[in-house]
Amino acid sequence: MNTIVMQADKKLQEKIRTDLAQHHISNNNPYVVFSAKISGTTVLLYTSGKLVFQGSNASHIAQKYGYIEQKESCSSETQDIPIIGTDEVGNGSYFGGLAVVASFVTPKDHAYLKKLGVGDSKTLTDQKIKQIAPLLEKAIPHKALLLSPQKYNQVVGPNNKHNAVSVKVALHNQAIFLLLQDGFEPEKIVIDAFTSSKNYQNYLKNEKNQFKQTITLEEKAENKYLAVAVSSIIARNLFLENLNKLSDDVGYKLPSGAGHQSDKVASQLLKAYGISSLEHCAKLHFANTKKAQALLK
């Protein structure tokens, strides 16, 4: 489990309380004045001002509050072989689909990718993503899958086949499988870790399409492998395109993420068109659905 510790001044403490109010959880530690859980990460604020992030997305969330991470570069030592790398975008957003991409990158691609400025898509602006992604789609063999919100709601949820993790396992597995079916021969397959290897393998047993190659799940893989960085950028662009299309469909600007703005837009859609509008453009099992309904009472 990743753990990041920071010191928060009064301004940052107030921001944490405001931003994460909807994710508040109880905590019996008398020295903890605020606690929340978001995207698999627990956030603890202590009376001393100490701010602790614990969980798989600790670094990503902490960076929103001033944490500066020492990034690992995409060094040639870790990727001087043909690699398939995968990443997903949209799993933390209430509106929009879930995009998963697998890309096949060889050492001969490295110079071109570095020239384009390929890196962790989370550090790139949406405008830069939109510029780079079409070039990558033409130059790099890849498979891109998009699970629309409507289809997502049919397969993910309490009474459906998948949960939020198993559906990602299915999509990552399928994207890799399709690349392998096209004859590409990686010496390594890397997934930007969203769960433990044990958990991944347990869910993988339920998948029809299997392959023999070993899979490696690594945290922050988009910073280590150009193949994962490519997938991250293409997936981000695919997600943004889908979000824009859905916005046009419903006539409202749909925000990315799962914050209070998503609650407000969802409540407006509910009032105007009913639950069917959210079935079309949002992931219904998110807590935002109930929060949006509460705003109408």
From Swiss-Prot:
Q: Which GO terms describe its cellular component?
A: cytoplasm; ribonuclease H2 complex
**Which residue intervals define the domain RNase H type-2 in the entry?**
81-297
- Which positions in this protein are listed as binding a divalent metal cation? 87-88, 192
Record PANTHER family = RIBONUCLEASE (PTHR10954:SF23), RIBONUCLEASE H2 SUBUNIT A (PTHR10954)
Catalytic activity field = Endonucleolytic cleavage to 5'-phosphomonoester
What does the record say about how the cofactor binds?
Manganese or magnesium. Binds 1 divalent metal ion per monomer in the absence of substrate. May bind a second metal ion after substrate binding.
Keyword Transmembrane helix assigned: no
Q: What's its job? A: Endonuclease that specifically degrades the RNA of RNA-DNA hybrids.
Cited InterPro entries: RNase_HII/HIII, RNase_HII/HIII_dom, RNase_HIII, RNase_HIII_N, RNaseH-like_sf, RNaseH_sf, TBP_dom_sf
Please tell me where this protein is predominantly located.
cytoplasm
Entry's Gene Ontology molecular function annotations: magnesium ion binding; RNA binding; RNA-DNA hybrid ribonuclease activity
Q: Which cofactor does it need?
A: Mn(2+); Mg(2+)
Q: Please give the name of this protein.
A: Ribonuclease HIII
Where in the cell? Cytoplasm
**Alphabetic keyword roster:** Cytoplasm, Endonuclease, Hydrolase, Magnesium, Metal-binding, Nuclease
Which Gene3D superfamilies has this protein been placed in? Ribonuclease H-like superfamily/Ribonuclease H, TATA-Binding Protein
Q: Quote the EC number.
A: 3.1.26.4
One of this protein's GO BP terms?
A: mismatch repair
Similarity annotation? Belongs to the RNase HII family. RnhC subfamily.
